[in-house]
């Protein structure tokens, strides 16, 4: 079992830029409130810090409205980092912005190359394997390139298929334990988590699945009291924050 799949010493975040109001949206729910986003970002950093990690806070990138979503630009493993190649054209340049910091932190750096596309939001590292969800942002070529990198490093990788109504694989799931997944019912129904223990979010609280296990805590979006209670009933310590 790869226990380190939720054990972290460091986290990289990026301050939201004022241009975030021009960012990509799966569903148009109106323009974000910049001041609120800054406040929410601070709460996120505080939650990470209280979970026991050292936070590396990168400066905002005004030319990349989605630049704060650093997860999509790289897959960080204990001994190597793989630079992604985002599927959204407006986000391609984000990788070059974060790469220098990652090269400082990792000795072994790999890259997904043109014409492949893959985003970190479609990759879930469990205690058994690396699950990669094919999606509108992650294509067959990108998945194949990633497989060619991580399998020689000793990992097991499995491709799954994200339902078309879901933007990223991890929009609807997150890791709770080495063999336990928090998931929406619609994603679980695809069969991608066969062989795992699955905790379903409450009906109507699907957005709560986009959480993150960091050491002893599950950091999840606020406003989903039923799912928070479900996680606590399963023995997890939960930090709910605005996001």
Where are these regions (language model features)?
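The feature marks the mature, well-folded catalytic cores of soluble enzymes
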Residues: 1-243
């Amino acid at each position: 079992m790869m226990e380190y799949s939720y054990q972290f010493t460091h986290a990289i975040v990026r301050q939201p830029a004022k241009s975030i109001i021009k960012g990509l949206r799966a569903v148009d729910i109106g323009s974000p409130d910049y001041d609120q986003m800054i406040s929410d970002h601070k709460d996120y950093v505080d939650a990470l810090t209280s979970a026991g990690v050292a936070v590396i806070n990168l400066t905002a990138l005004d030319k990349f409205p989605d630049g704060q979503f650093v997860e999509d630009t790289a897959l960080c493993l204990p001994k190597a980092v793989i630079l992604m190649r985002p599927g959204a054209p407006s986000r391609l340049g984000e990788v070059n912005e974060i790469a220098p910091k990652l090269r400082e932190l990792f000795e072994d750096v790999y890259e997904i190359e043109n014409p492949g596309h893959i985003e970190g939001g479609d990759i879930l590292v469990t205690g058994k394997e690396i699950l990669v969800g094919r999606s509108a942002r992650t294509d067959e070529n990108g998945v194949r390139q990633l497989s060619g990198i991580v399998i020689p490093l000793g990992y097991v990788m499995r491709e799954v298929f994200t339902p078309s109504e879901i933007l990223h694989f991890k929009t609807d799931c997150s890791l709770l334990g080495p063999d336990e997944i928090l998931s929406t019912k619609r994603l679980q129904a695809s069969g991608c988590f066969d062989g795992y223990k699955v905790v379903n979010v409450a009906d109507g609280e699907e957005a709560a699945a986009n959480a993150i296990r960091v050491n002893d805590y599950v950091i999840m979006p606020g406003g989903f009291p039923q799912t928070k209670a479900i996680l606590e009933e399963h023995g997890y310590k939960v930090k709910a924050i605005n996001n």
